[in-house]
Amino acid sequence: MKRTRFFSRTVLVLTLHWTASSSCYSAETDAAAIKTEITKRHEEAVKRLQDWVGQVSIAAENRGYPEGAEYMAKLARDAGFQQATVINTDGKPGVFATLDASALKTVGLYFMYDVKQFDPAEWSSPPTEARIVDKPPLGKVMIGRGAVNQKGPEAAFLAALHAIRGAGKKMPVNLVMVAEGEEEIGSPHIPQLVRRPEVLAALKKCVGVFMPFAAQDLDGVVTVNLGSKGVIELELVSSGEKWGRGPAKDIHSSLKAMVDSPAWHLVKALNTLVSDDGNVIMIDNYPKPLPLTAEQKAMIEKVSKTRSEALAKKQFSVQHWINDLPWDQANERLESQPTVNIEGLVGGYTGPGGKTILPHRAVAKIDMRLVPDMKAADALAALKAHLAKRGFGDIEVNMTGGYDPTATSKDSALIQAQLATYKKFGIDALLWPRNAGSYPGYVFTGEPLKLAAGHFGLGHGSGAHAPDEYYIIESTNPKIQGFDGATMSFVEYLYELAK
C-alpha cells in the first residue's frame, strides 16, 4: 500500500481517573441505578453509534486515517478519559488507553475502529447512514458497515461506562484499552502497539483481555469461544513480465494461439493448492493442525444439539455443508480444519459485455485460516516452497497481514466470569473450542504476556463483511438482548470480573 507522511501512524495514549461518591460498591446495589441510567441515555448512545458508523476507516483503501483514530480518541474522552498522548508508530493510528479506578483488578480491552470495504449498490440503505429499520421478527436494527463488526458492541461497552459514571457509581475494575485501525487487513502492525514498554507494562497487570462482541444467535443461544483461528491474507500475482512468458501488456485474444496466458498460469497454480473439490489443502509440507481433544469434541456435540442447523443455513444463505456432512460433523470440521479460501479473482476485462484481450496480469486474493498449533510463518513458507516446487516460482506471494491462532483455558478468570454473567441473564452459555473467524488475540495470549483473551457481550447482529450488516437496537424476541441489554451485560461483566 502506498503511504505518505501525512498518513503516518500514531497511537493515542489516554488516561482516566474516575471519582465516585462512595468507595463501596456491589453489582446488586448499583445495578438498578445503572440500568435506569442506561434507559435514560438510550437515544444519545444510539446516536453515538450512528455517528461512529458514519466515520469510516478502511485500511485496504487507505480511507479515513488519521480521522478514525482521532474519532476513537474522542469517543474515549467522551466516556471519561482525560489525558491523551500521541505516539508515532509504523502502523495506522492506534489507541492505547488506561482507566485507573483505584480498583484491585485490571481488565484489558481490545477494540478495532476500522471496517471492511463495501459497495453501496448492494445495500438496501446507505452503509454509512446507520439507518434504523424494522427487521421482522428481530425488531428494530441498525443497518450499516461496522454495525456488528465491531462498532455496535464496542459502542454498547462505551455506553456502559457512560451509565456507570452517570449513575454516580465507582468503576469496579481498572481498564487498559488497545484499539487498532488495521484489523480488517490482518493487523500487520499491532505488535508495534502492544509491545511498546508502557503498553506491555499496563497489560501485564490485567487478568485478561476481551473484545466487545454480540454473542447471541437467532435463538438467543450464547457460545463462549475459547480461542480463535489464525489467518494469513495474501495476494498471488501472475504476470507475463515476471513469468517471462505471456505478454507484458494486454494484447488481442486472437494471439492466445501462440502466446501463453498469465491468467491460466494463475488458475493452474491455484489448482495445486487444494483437492479437486477445493476443500482439502494439498500444499506440500503444510503445517499439521492439532487434533481436537475429547473434551473439545464433547463441546461441539453439545452445541450441535442446542443450536439450530436450519437457522444457521438461513443465516449463511446455504443449502448444504461440505460433502453434505450432518450438522455435528460440519461443526467439527469448522473447528478443526485449516482452510485456503479464494476471496476474489481479478484479471483482464470485467466490465459489461466482452472485450477480446489476453490479459498480461491476474491476481488471486487469498485467505488461509489456521488452527492450533499452526504458525502463520510456517504456513507462508510452505506455500512459497510448494509453488516453486510445482513450477510456479514466478508467481508473487504478497502477504498483507496475518497472525497465529489463539487458545484460552475455560478455567481462566476471564472465561469463568463470562459464564457467571450470562447465567445472571438466565443463559447457560455453551463452550466452543474456538471462533472460526480470526482476530489478533495472539499478541495477548502469546509471549511475553500469556494472558487469557476472548470475546464477550449479549446482543445479536449479522452480515459482517456483507451487504446489509445489522445490529439489533430494540429486540422483539425476549431471548435476545437489544442495545440497552447488551450495555447492561458489560456492566455486569465488569462487576463479575472485580470479584
Regions inferred by a protein language model and the residue ranges of each:
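Bacterial N-terminal signal peptides that target proteins for export
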Residues: 1-11
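Bacterial N-terminal signal peptides
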Residues: 9-23
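Metal-dependent peptidase/peptidase-like ectodomains
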Residues: 198-201, 206-263, 271, 376-422
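Short, solvent-exposed loop/turn segments at the edges of secondary structure
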Residues: 125, 172, 205, 227-233, ...
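Polar, glycine-rich mid-to-C-terminal structural blocks
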Residues: 234-310
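Acidic/His- and Gly-rich active-site-bordering loop/insert found
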Residues: 27-147, 166-173, 366
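Acidic/histidine-rich catalytic neighborhood of metal-dependent amide-processing enzymes
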Residues: 141, 146-227, 498
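An extended, acidic, His-containing surface patch that forms the Zn2+-binding/catalytic region
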Residues: 187, 218-219, 282-361, 369-382, ...
